[in-house]
Amino acid sequence: MPIRDQIIQIVRGHDLTEEQAAEAMEEIMTGVATPAQVAALLTALHLKGETDAEIAGMARVMRAKAIPVHFDGPLLDTCGTGGDSAGTFNISTTAAFIAAGAGATVAKHGNRAMSSVCGSADVLEGLGVTIDLDAAGVARCLEQAGIGFMFAQKFHPAMRFVGPVRREIGIRTIFNALGPLSNPAQARHQTLGVADPALAEKMARALYLLGAQHALVVHGHGGLDELTLSGPNLVIEVRAGHKPRRYEVSAGDLGLTPAPREALLGGDVSTNVAIVRAILSGEERGARRDVALLNAAAALVAADYAADLREGLQQARQSLESGAALARLERLITVSSINR
């Protein structure tokens, strides 16, 4: 079905099947669809409301069009959809180093700031990591440092057909959901934060359709796209071969001290770099450390290193207190700079 017919179908209030969504994405990612058609499709989907099948179908094509990163072994990603406008520091990036220090191999996929001041690419660059590596460079980091970063714009060349349209229409679209589902290293273990609780269910079902091995989709109290300390957090756990399981978790349930969102605020790149370093070095002992530990615990559950969040917290604390998490950062800085 041509994308023109799919636009008409959506405008009439009908959902696309996973296959139809994939067909539309194929036209977009190959430049067959015109900019006007891309804008119309994205806007129509936004107004109708994207389904899990539509998200999965388009993500499947986006994965296929990405430049692949090859690694022999299970991989973990920690990321979020963004859009919470909360101004927190780079929690999932900090959690990635803690999880790596506990033994998980982390293939982090991210970009520069979109809705915030400092994205994962920005803070990693500020920390001294070389962020614009090719696939071979990232694979080397995974093998030698236990963690690697894939700069999204480097690995998704087909996005050149979409980027200008997204900037011009200026609304959140299905592509905000697709980024976290399009890891070029095909990481099948994942924590995925969403700011919109309605999107959490859709993302969990999309991950299931895409064959995730083990993933935790989280929606933080107060509308954050991270687990937070201020109240009950929604978790939807996805395991291969099992229906997604929904539950809530609070900081107090795990022995962590509750704290308001304001205690997790970050700032510009230099501020967030200092915060990440303070946590990984053991200098920071307050709420920022606790929220990084909590999100690292979730990552370790998703990576199948921990049976539950309580065990994950123990492993995360050990990673920090032993210096292993900081060592992963220092090693990534070194390995990513080879042959630069």
Swiss-Prot record:
Reactions that this protein is recorded to catalyse: N-(5-phospho-beta-D-ribosyl)anthranilate + diphosphate = 5-phospho-alpha-D-ribose 1-diphosphate + anthranilate
EC numbers: 2.4.2.18
Binding, Mg(2+) 2: 225-226
Pathway the protein acts in: Amino-acid biosynthesis; L-tryptophan biosynthesis; L-tryptophan from chorismate: step 2/5
Gene Ontology terms describing biological process: L-tryptophan biosynthetic process
Keywords of this entry: Amino-acid biosynthesis, Aromatic amino acid biosynthesis, Glycosyltransferase, Magnesium, Metal-binding, Transferase, Tryptophan biosynthesis
Binding residue positions for 5-phospho-alpha-D-ribose 1-diphosphate: 80, 83-84, 88, 90-93, 108-116, 120
Keyword Acetylation in annotation: no
Alphabetized Pfam families for the sequence: Glycos_trans_3N, Glycos_transf_3
Binding site for Mg(2+) 1: 92, 226
GO molecular function, one term: anthranilate phosphoribosyltransferase activity
GO cellular component, one term: cytosol
Residue positions binding anthranilate 2: 166
Keyword Translocase among UniProt keywords: no
Cofactor(s) needed for function: Mg(2+)
Cofactor note: Binds 2 magnesium ions per monomer.
Residues at which anthranilate 1 binds: 80, 111
Family of this protein: Belongs to the anthranilate phosphoribosyltransferase family.
Known function: Catalyzes the transfer of the phosphoribosyl group of 5-phosphorylribose-1-pyrophosphate (PRPP) to anthranilate to yield N-(5'-phosphoribosyl)-anthranilate (PRA).
Assembly mode: Homodimer.
Name the record gives this protein: Anthranilate phosphoribosyltransferase
Organism encoding this protein: Roseiflexus castenholzii (strain DSM 13941 / HLO8)
Gene for this chain: trpD
